Regions:
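Amphipathic, Lys/Arg-enriched alpha-helical patches that create a basic surface
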Residues: 328-336
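An alpha-helical support segment within catalytic cores of ATP-dependent transferases
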Residues: 43-49, 149-222, 233, 288-290, ...
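Phosphate/pyrophosphate-binding loops and the adjoining catalytic core of nucleotide-dependent enzymes
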Residues: 1-114, 119-124, 133-156, 296-300
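Hydrophobic alpha-helical core bundles mediating ligand binding, dimerization, or RNAP-core interactions
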Residues: 137-141, 145, 199, 203, ...
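Active-site activation/catalytic loop segments of kinase-like enzymes and analogous catalytic loops
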Residues: 255-292, 303-320
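Active-site acidic catalytic loop and adjacent metal/ATP-binding pocket
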Residues: 52, 61-65, 70, 207-254
Length: 336
C-alpha cells in the first residue's frame, strides 16, 4: 500500500507473458506502470538484460539473465545488500547451504549475483512427484536445524553478533503498522466498517501474545523466509538460499512460522493439495521440535504473519485472514 488511502502498487503477471510488471491500483482503477521507476534508476537498462522476475515498485527488482541474477535497489542501498551477502557466506555452513556470489557491483543501486541451479521448493510442488517433493522438504528441514543451532566458529559468531535485532517488540510494532495502514486505506469503505473492530481486536491479541510470553533464545534468522527463496538440489549438494535483505538475530519461530504460513495460505487458496501441504508442514514442525521452539512462540509469530497478509488488495484475503485467526484461536482454546 501507498500512504494515500485507496492507493496500492502491485507486482502483476499476465498469462502467456513471461516475467512480471508493476501496476498501480488507485481508487479502484488499475493501470500498468511504465518501465521507468523514479526510485529505481537502474531498472530500465537492467530489465533489458533478461526477464523481470520480481518487482516491488519503488523499492527493488530482480532480473534473471542468462547466467546471473541482477538485483536493482533504491539509490545507495546496494552496498548494504552486498555486505549482507558477504556476511552470510561466512555464517552459513557450506555443506548445507549455498549463497549467490557477487559478480559485480556496477553502481550504488545494482548488483549482479551468480545463479544457483535448481528449482525452488515452491516450484518443486508443480514439477516433482510425491517422493521427490517429500525428499526436498526433508533435506531442507535437516539442513535448517544445525544451521540455526550452530555452533559457529569465531568468524561466524562475529557476523551473527553484528546482525540487527528482530525482536518480538519489533514484530508487534509491525503488526500495528499493518493494522493502522489498513484502517487508513479503508476508512471510507462502508462495507468494511463492521470489520474494523474485529481487526483491531485481532491485532491486540497478536501483539499481546508476542509480548506476553518469554522469548526463545536469539539465533540467526533469514528474516523473511518462504519456499521461493530455497533452491532444491539433488544428492548431497547443498541447498541454495536467496535474499538476505532482512537477515537478523531473532527467535527461530520467526522464519519457521513464515514458511509455514505461506504453505497454509496456498492450501487455503486451493493452490496446494492437502497431501503436499501435510508433507511440507510436517517437516516445518520437525524443525520446530528439534530447535525446541516454544509452541506459544511459534503460534504468536504465525498469527503475526497471517495478520501481515491482511493488507493485500486481493479479493477475499482480508476475510480469510480474520477467519484463520479466529479458527486458530478457537482450536488452541479447545486444546486441538
Amino acid at each position: 500500500p501507498e500512504r494515500a488511502p485507496g492507493r496500492y502498487v502491485l507486482e502483476v503477471s499476465t498469462p502467456g507473458r513471461r516475467g512480471v510488471r508493476g501496476a498501480r491500483l488507485r481508487d479502484g482503477h488499475f493501470k500498468l506502470m511504465p518501465p521507468d521507476d523514479p526510485r529505481l534508476p537502474g531498472l530500465r537498462v537492467e530489465a533489458q538484460q533478461g526477464e523481470l522476475v520480481s518487482y516491488r515498485p519503488y523499492d527493488r527488482a530482480v532480473v534473471r539473465a542468462e547466467d546471473r541474477y541482477i538485483k536493482i535497489f533504491r539509490a545507495g542501498r546496494a552496498d548494504i545488500a552486498a555486505e549482507r551477502c558477504a556476511q552470510l557466506d561466512i555464517l552459513l555452513d557450506a555443506d548445507s547451504f549455498r549463497v549467490p556470489k557477487i559478480l559485480s557491483c556496477r553502481s550504488p543501486d545494482v548488483i549482479a549475483f551468480s545463479a544457483i541451479p535448481g528449482p525452488t521448493l515452491y516450484e518443486v510442488d508443480s514439477t516433482a512427484d510425491d517422493e521427490a517433493f517429500a525428499g526436498a522438504w526433508k533435506k531442507w528441514s535437516r539442513a535448517w536445524v544445525p544451521q540455526v543451532n550452530g555452533p559457529y566458529g569465531p568468524a561466524a559468531e562475529s557476523v551473527l553478533d553484528s546482525l540487527p535485532l528482530h525482536s518480538a517488540e519489533l514484530e508487534a510494532t509491525k503488526v500495528w503498522r499493518t493494522v493502522n495502514l489498513w484502517m487508513q486505506h479503508n476508512e471510507n469503505v462502508p462495507d468494511l466498517m463492521p470489520l474494523r473492530g474485529a481487526l483491531r481486536g485481532a491485532a491486540e491479541e497478536v501483539a499481546s501474545n508476542l509480548l506476553g510470553s518469554a522469548p526463545d533464545p536469539l539465533v540467526w534468522a533469514h528474516g523473511g523466509l518462504h519456499d521461493k527463496q530455497i533452491i532444491a538440489t539433488g544428492g548431497l549438494s547443498p541447498l541454495g538460499l536467496l535474499d538476505f535483505d532482512k537477515t537478523a538475530r531473532a527467535e527461530a519461530a520467526l522464519d519457521l512460522a513464515s514458511v509455514d504460513v505461506y504453505l497454509e495460505l496456498r492450501l487455503r487458496e486451493n493452490r496446494m493439495t492437502p497431501a503436499r501441504y501435510r508433507t511440507a508442514h510436517t517437516q516445518v514442525l520437525a524443525a520446530v521440535d528439534e530447535l525446541h521452539v516454544n509452541p506459544a512462540r511459534f503460534h504468536a509469530y504465525s498469527d503475526a504473519k497471517w495478520l501481515s497478509l491482511a493488507n493485500m488488495p486481493l479479493r477475499g484475503r482480508f476475510s480469510l485472514v480474520l477467519a484463520v485467526l479466529a479458527e486458530k484461536k478457537a482450536a488452541r482454546r479447545a486444546g486441538t
